[in-house]
Amino acid sequence: DLWELAKMILKETGKNPLPSYGAYGCYCGWGG
């Protein structure tokens, strides 16, 4: 799904692919 794709992009690029979802990303744990 989109979230899995976003995590893959983050892993590959080291960048958050969804900057507009920064707060949501923090909630879900971009760092693992």
From Swiss-Prot:
The keyword Metal-binding applies. It catalyses: a 1,2-diacyl-sn-glycero-3-phosphocholine + H2O = a 1-acyl-sn-glycero-3-phosphocholine + a fatty acid + H(+). It comes from the Eukaryota. Binds 1 Ca(2+) ion. Its cofactor is Ca(2+). Keywords: Calcium, Disulfide bond, Hydrolase, Lipid degradation, Lipid metabolism, Metal-binding, Myotoxin, Secreted, Toxin. This is Basic phospholipase A2 BmatTX-III. Monomer. GO terms for biological process: arachidonate secretion; lipid catabolic process; phospholipid metabolic process. The keyword RNA-binding does not apply. Its EC number is 3.1.1.4. Does not induce platelet aggregation and does not inhibit collagen or ADP-induced platelet aggregation. Pfam families: Phospholip_A2_1. Belongs to the phospholipase A2 family. Group II subfamily. K49 sub-subfamily.
